[in-house]
């Protein structure tokens, strides 16, 4: 019996030590950590980071584009695209979801409603009164869809870039994410190797586009948010409480609203398979489909 107890204690130490090392120095995000540009919007669940970009006066068209990022990578994924929208005369609003980037990490269940209501709260806080153009990348796609269903009069158009919601869920793959304690241990211990593995696989040098992020720069920017408490909780809670695999019913409903829609998808997407375009076009048949041959899941920053 004594040997069993000693053995269990050794196993506990082996598991606890790397977890302690990885989590002990995590910081609480504060306003002093924010970039010089942008700020916090005080919402019901906490402070949400946002930043505005404005076109030159002579190009301004008085239209607002809101860029909604995906599961784990915050607003920097839009850096290479902003210039094109500004040149076209749009004002741009970017933000970080709760639990990501420079937004606070409330200890809550990260459900669909949290993301939809935070988008609504942000627009209200910024006194955006006119309908906006929503652009959703990956997880941002379902968020844009759900928001449009709930607030159709607030949306001018939708653009869906490699939208989540058309993936086949495999219960034998990454099952540990859904398990309490197990998921927390794995993600805290192995960090970016697990969190950003899908993006890393798709982010391969060399890059011909001067606006593209190198793998090194991507990991540096994406990993910055991991030094703050609550990031891993936000990812795990989102995976457990927001269905990112099957959003067909929602997209079918939003298709009935007949909002102008653009869908952009890469044929070699290893995260949200390109075959999802067939089902999306069934639900939103009026959508314009832009196919990027050999494009992968990192198409917003590659």
Per-region residue spans from a language model:
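Short beta-strand/loop motif that positions the catalytic acidic residue
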Residues: 257, 263-265, 269
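Conserved HGGG/HGGXW glycine-rich cap/lid loop of the alpha/beta-hydrolase fold
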Residues: 53-102
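Active-site loop/oxyanion-hole signature of alpha/beta-hydrolase fold enzymes
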Residues: 43-45, 51-57, 87, 97-135, ...
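Conserved alpha/beta-hydrolase catalytic His-Asp/Glu region
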Residues: 29, 189-255
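Alpha/beta-hydrolase fold catalytic core
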Residues: 1-63, 87-90, 248
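Conserved alpha/beta-hydrolase "acid-adjacent" motif
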Residues: 270-276
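Flexible "cap/lid" loop of the alpha/beta hydrolase fold
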Residues: 149, 156-189
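Catalytic histidine-centered segment of alpha/beta-hydrolase-like enzymes
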Residues: 271, 295-302
């Amino acid at each position: 019996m004594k040997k069993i107890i000693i053995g269990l204690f050794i196993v506990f130490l082996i598991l606890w030590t790397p977890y302690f090392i990885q989590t002990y120095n995590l910081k609480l995000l504060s306003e002093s950590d924010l970039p010089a540009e942008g700020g916090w919007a005080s919402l019901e669940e906490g402070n949400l980071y946002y930043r505005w970009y404005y076109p030159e006066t002579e190009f301004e068209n008085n239209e607002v584009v809101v860029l909604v990022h995906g599961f784990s990578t915050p607003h920097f994924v839009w850096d290479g695209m902003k210039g094109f929208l500004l040149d076209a005369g749009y004002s741009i609003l970017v933000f970080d979801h709760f639990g990501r980037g420079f937004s606070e990490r409330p200890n809550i269940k990260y459900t669909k409603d949290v993301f939809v209501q935070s988008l609504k709260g942000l627009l209200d806080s910024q006194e955006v009164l006119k309908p906006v153009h929503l652009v959703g990348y990956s997880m941002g796609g379902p968020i844009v869809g759900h928001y449009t269903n709930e607030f159709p009069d607030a949306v001018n158009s939708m653009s869906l870039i490699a939208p989540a919601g058309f993936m086949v869920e495999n219960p034998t793959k990454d099952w540990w994410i859904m398990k309490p304690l197990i998921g927390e241990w794995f993600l805290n211990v192995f960090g970016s190797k697990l969190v950003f593995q899908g993006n890393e696989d798709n982010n391969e040098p060399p890059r011909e586009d001067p606006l593209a992020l190198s793998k090194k720069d991507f990991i540096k920017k994406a990993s910055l948010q991991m030094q703050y408490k609550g990031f891993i909780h936000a990812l795990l809670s989102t995976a457990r409480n927001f269905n990112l695999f099957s959003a067909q019913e929602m997209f079918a409903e939003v298709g009935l609203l007949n909002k102008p829609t653009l869908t952009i998808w890469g044929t070699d997407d290893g995260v949200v398979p390109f075959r999802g375009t067939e089902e999306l076009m069934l639900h939103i048949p009026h959508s314009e489909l832009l196919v990027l041959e050999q494009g992968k899941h990192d198409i917003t920053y590659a």
